[in-house]
Amino acid sequence: GVPCLCDSDGPSVRGNTLSGILWLAGCPSGWHNCKKHKPTIGWCCK
């Protein structure tokens, strides 16, 4: 997956660690969708 910004990472992608992973279909086991974006795209964070 592609790294994405979790809520716990901070308000901006600049200077922050991207601890989330962008998945196209849901989230892997042990992860949760941290943003309500599109139903087919999961902004997955631990």
Swiss-Prot record:
Q: Which Gene3D superfamilies does this one have?
A: Anthopleurin-A
Instruction: List UniProt keywords, sorted A-Z.
Output: Disulfide bond, Ion channel impairing toxin, Nematocyst, Neurotoxin, Secreted, Toxin, Voltage-gated sodium channel impairing toxin
The entry's stated outcome for P39G is: In 50% of the molecules
Q: What's this protein's name?
A: Delta-actitoxin-Avd1d
The job of this chain, per UniProt, is described as: Binds specifically to voltage-gated sodium channels (Nav), thereby delaying their inactivation during signal transduction. Thus it strongly stimulates mammalian cardiac muscle contraction.
Q: List the disulfide bonds.
A: C4-C44, C6-C34, C27-C45
Similarity remark: Belongs to the sea anemone sodium channel inhibitory toxin family. Type I subfamily.
Coiled coil location: none
Q: Which GO terms describe its biological process?
A: regulation of signal transduction
- Supply one GO CC term from the record: extracellular region
Signal peptide annotation: none
Q: Which Pfam families match?
A: Toxin_4 (PF00706)
**Entries under InterPro entries matching the protein:** Anenome_toxin, Myo_ane_neurotoxin_sf
A GO molecular function annotation here is: toxin activity
Cellular compartments annotated: Secreted; Nematocyst
